[in-house]
Regions:
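Conserved ATP/PPi-binding loop(s) of AMP-dependent carboxylate-activating enzymes
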Residues: 341-381, 419, 461
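Conserved pre-ATP/AMP-binding loop-to-beta segment of ANL
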Residues: 16-17, 131, 145-163, 170, ...
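Gly/Ser/Thr-rich phosphate-binding loop
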Residues: 220, 245-249, 259-323, 328-332
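Conserved structural elements of the adenylate-forming
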Residues: 33-39, 174-195, 203, 207, ...
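ANL superfamily adenylate-forming
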Residues: 108-155
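Conserved AMP-binding/adenylation subdomain of ANL enzymes
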Residues: 182-199, 207-247, 261
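Conserved AMP-binding A3 loop
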Residues: 29-32, 159-183
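AMP-binding/adenylate-forming catalytic core of the ANL superfamily
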Residues: 65, 86, 103, 248, ...
Length: 511
């Protein structure tokens, strides 16, 4: 198998003049970009970095972040990308846990980095429109003289270490080898039916599995990566229209924002022929609106994780809303009963069709990681009998398609019944007055937990109207919300996942 450095060189050799990356006014071909990557690779060596070392980035989606990523692959160095919003204590934990040797930041993340203990110990390079100082070099200084890159990495080298944003405790490092990354990139190309020269929007963060895969897969087909440093609907629409973007791969929240913008018009996105989403379930209403506005040739629901990139794929998401499809080309999946035997057991108890359980995935798959970084406690919880316990709940329908219903931790147990939030959210999303909805279980003396719907409205509506909407649907009565709370915003993570724990703890503002 080719390592990732050779994968990039393959793209340069195949079509050196093809436009590789766009970031504002910056436009580089594969041949031009390669010399920037090579110059940075040589800088790594000048600092004594070697295969197996790790470097830290606290950057938005910019040209520098993508260049650093590829330079690391060339050198066999692992990149440890963090959210640019990371606080000093988060930077310290991840940097110390990963034992990084060098860091890259930009203006927006500089103060938090310098306030961290890491900032006092590890050399930092300044990216973007920041001049170098006596103490800190500027990124642009490192690439003044272009150098051809050399693929010195290996498929067994760690390519990237993503830190998962756990709901409790410290984040877990997910080391992914170049072998698994290349397999995931090729799978992404195949499952999204990429053509040579595809153009996509580089807005999903490069500290997130979706963002990394977007970058890698574009190289495999000599595509163009149009960098959008942070989510801004108007800038995203401008980029789609100007650069004639052909494919979008976003979380549902960003699609929601796009359709809700006054600047959105079908004509502005007519170049987009393929849509994909991942990171969170998409409600039925948004799915149908997107299909009507874009008329995509392909509409992919991709279900996976940082640990194993692809679990399942549905290449026609509109045909059966809510279906995550069937196992991806490198995956095997099962649904096991929520209540299992002792952890020492060498077998699982499997759920029946239509029975909700926990989704698991075979760790022998080409896209899988091999265990968490320095976290045997996390391995013991999530790795069992050669399978990865995803922590997600779902079920197979009669045709063998997977429906993802939520997280094991999000399961509402009301009056002894297990209730998943996603089904209720999809039904409420179809009400014309509902802009966004999230469902959670709140403590109840009689039921244990009661189903509560948190609603952001697009037009006036009251609880009785929403309740009648649920009663007239096929939602069984015990799943019907017992309370409706109208909020100004639904709390979400930086990549658009609903933060139900904040709803449960009362961390929201009523409308």
């Amino acid at each position: 198998m080719l390592d990732l450095g050779r994968t990039f060189l393959q793209a340069v050799e195949r079509d050196p003049a093809r436009l590789a990356i766009v970031d504002g006014s910056l436009r580089l071909s594969y041949e031009e970009w390669a010399t920037h990557i090579g110059a940075l690779q040589q800088y790594f060596y000048s600092k004594g970095l070697a295969r197996g070392d790790r470097i830290l980035t606290v950057l938005q989606n910019r040209y520098e972040a993508a260049t650093i990523h590829w330079a690391c692959q060339m050198a066999g160095i692992a990149i440890v990308p963090l959210n640019w919003r990371s606080k000093p204590e988060e930077i310290d934990y991840c940097a110390q846990n990963a034992d990084v040797k060098l860091a890259f930041v930009e203006q927006i993340s500089l103060n938090n980095y310098l306030d961290s203990e890491t900032g006092k110990k590890i050399e930092v390079i300044l990216c973007g429109d920041i001049d170098g100082t006596a103490n800190h070099k500027a990124f642009n200084e490192l690439i003044k003289v272009g150098v051809d890159p050399i693929a010195n990495g290996d498929v067994e080298d760690i390519s990237v270490m993503l830190f998962t944003s756990g709901t409790t405790g410290k984040p877990k490092g997910v080391p992914r080898k170049q072998r698994a990354e290349r397999a995931a990139g090729i799978a992404h190309v195949a499952q999204n039916q990429y053509a040579m020269g595809e153009v996509t929007l580089g807005v999903m963060p490069l500290y997130h599995t979706m963002g990394v895969r977007t970058l890698l897969s574009l190289c495999i087909v000599n595509g163009t990566y149009v960098a959008v440093p942070r989510w801004d609907v108007e800038k995203a629409l401008d980029a789609i229209e100007t650069e004639k973007v052909t494919h979008l791969y976003l979380v549902p929240t960003l699609y929601h924002d796009m359709l809700g913008s006054k600047k959105f018009h079908d004509d502005r996105v007519k170049s987009v022929r393929k849509l994909g989403f991942a990171g969170a379930p998409m409600n039925d209403a948004l799915l149908l609106k997107l299909n009507k506005s874009f008329h995509p040739e392909l509409f992919v629901n991709h279900y996976g994780s940082s640990e194993i990139y692809t679990y399942t794929i549905n290449q026609n998401a509109v045909a059966k809303p809510g279906s995550a499809g069937k196992a991806g080309i490198n995956a095997r999946i099962r649904v096991i009963k929520l209540e299992q035997g002792p952890e020492s057991s060498s077998s699982f108890m499997y759920a029946e069709p239509k029975e909700e359980g926990q989704i698991i995935c075979d760790l022998a798959g080409d896209e899988a990681f091999e265990g968490y970084w320095k976290r045997p406690d996390a391995d013991a919880k999530s790795l069992r009998n050669g399978w990865f316990l995803t922590g997600d709940t779902g079920y197979f329908d009669d045709s063998g398609e997977l429906f993802v219903t939520g997280r094991v931790d999000d399961m509402i147990i009301s009056g002894g019944e297990n209730i998943s939030p996603v089904e209720i959210e999809s039904i409420l999303s179809l009400h014309t007055a509902v802009s966004e909805v999230a469902v959670a279980g709140l403590k109840d003396d009689r039921l244990g937990q009661k189903v509560v719907a948190f609603i952001k409205t697009s037009s006036p509506v009251d609880a009785s109207s929403l309740d009648e909407h649920c009663r007239s649907s096929d939602l069984v009565n015990f799943k019907r919300p017992r309370e409706y709370i109208f909020v100004k915003e639904i709390p979400k993570s930086p990549v658009g996942k609903i933060l139900r724990r904040m709803l449960v703890s009362g961390e929201y503002e009523k409308a």
